[in-house]
Amino acid sequence: IRADGSSRLKDKWCYFPSAALAWDLKQENFLKENSFIDQLKLRLGYGSVGNQSVEAYRIYSKMSPVRNSDGSTSYKVDRPAAPYLKWERNDQVNVGIDFGILNGRVRLTADWYNKVSKDILLELAQPTHMGYSSLLMNSGEIKNTGVEFTISADPFTNKDFNWHTDLTLAHNKGTYASIPTPNHRQQQAGNYQNQLFQMIEGEKLGTFWGYTFDGIWQEDEVNAPFIDANGNATGETNGKVYGVVAGNSKYIDVNKDGKINTEDQGIIGCGQPTFNWGWNNSFNYKNFDFSFFVVGFHGFDIYNATKQIGFGLIGSQQVAGVTPMRDFLDRWTPTHTNTNVPGFTNGGTENKDFFSTRFVENGSFIKMKSITLGYTLPELACKALGISNLRVYASIQNPFHITSYSGLDPEATMGSPLVQGVDWGAYPVSYTHLRAHETLRH
C-alpha cells in the first residue's frame, strides 16, 4: 500500500494498494519432467494508481484585468475555483499466462485486464449563463477492458541462418461507464475540435457527435412540398422551410420539425480502434542481417476536419486564398447533379461548420514502421584493419502505409484516448532514412 499526497488538490492524501500472485506450474511435479513444456505460469494482479495532473493552484479562482473605457482597470473572474478536486483513481485487475515450449523457441504471453478510472479530472463545457466556458471537476467513470497476446518464436536456427519473429495482438474497449448528468451525456471543454466529441454513458471513448449528411439538395427536392412528422404536407416547399437552394448540402431532419438543429445530432463515428497488431522480424544470414517491423490498426473512423476546413473556407462564390481542391472539379452544377460536393450557389444555407458524416472515413491502416539491412565485417578482416568490430547498415522509418483514408497519414490522428481519430491538419509521421556504420577500435 502506498500513500500519495499532492498540494494541488483539496483532498491531498489518497491510498493505493496493490498485490500480485503467480503460480509457476513448471515447478510442480506433474510438469517438472516434461521436456516439451519449458514454462507455464499463471499470473493474477491488482493495482491502484492515482492521477493529480492539474496545474498548480488550480483549486483557486483566477482574476484577469479588464481595461475600462475611461482608462481605469477592473478585474473579473477569469477562471472559477475548483475547491473540491480530489485524486483521480485507476484500479486495474490483470490475469495472465506465460507459456513456452521447444526449449524456448516458441513463447506465448496472454493477458486480460479490466481497468476502471473513477473521479476523472476533466474540463467540462459550461452553458453561457455560467459566465465561464468550462469547469474543472471530478466527473464520471471510464472502463477499459481488453486482451493482449504476444507470440515470440525462432522458426529456423542453424549455423548460417536464423529467423526470430514477434507478433503482438491487442484489443481494447474503452467506454464511459458513468456520466453524472441528467441526460448522461457531457460535452468536453477545450478547443473547437473537442465539440466533435461527446462523453455518452455506455458509449466508447472517441465517439463522434454530429449530423447525418444526406447528399445534395436537387432542384426537384427543393421545390417538393415539406412533409412534417405526421406525414402531412404543410403547404410550403422544402426550400422555403429549410432555407436551401439546389446545390446546398442536405442533412437528415431526424424529428421532421423543419429545422436542422442540435435535436438532429447523433453518433456519427468513433475514433477508437477495435484491435491493433504489430509484427517484428529479424533475419541473420552469415554476416548479413535484415529486419522489418509492421503494424496495423483496424475498426475505427477518422474525421477528416482538414478536408472540411478546405470546403468551409469558401464563402458564397469567393475562393480567393483557398488552395484549390480537386474535389471542386466535381462540385454540383445544374448540369452535373450526380455528386456529393456542394455547388457554388448564390443563396440558401450552406452549413459549413457542421460536423457530419460527410467527412467521416474509414481509418484502418497497415504501416511499415521500419526496414533495416546490415552487414558485419568478418572478424579476420576487422583484425587486419586494427578494429574489433565494423557493421554497416541502412535503415528506413515509415516508408509506406496501406489505407483507404484520403488524408496524409491515419496514424497521425491517434492522440489522446478521449479525442482520438480527428485529422485537424495533423502533421504526418515523418519518413526518414539513415545510412551509418558502427566501429569499435581496439
Q: Where in this protein do the model-derived segments appear?
A:
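Single conserved hydrophobic/aromatic residue that forms the stacking wall/gate
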Residues: H433, L440-H442
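Active-site-adjacent bridging/hinge elements
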Residues: I1, S69-T73, L122-A125, I252-G258, ...
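Glycine-rich, aromatic-lined ligand/substrate-binding cores of catalytic
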Residues: G271-I302
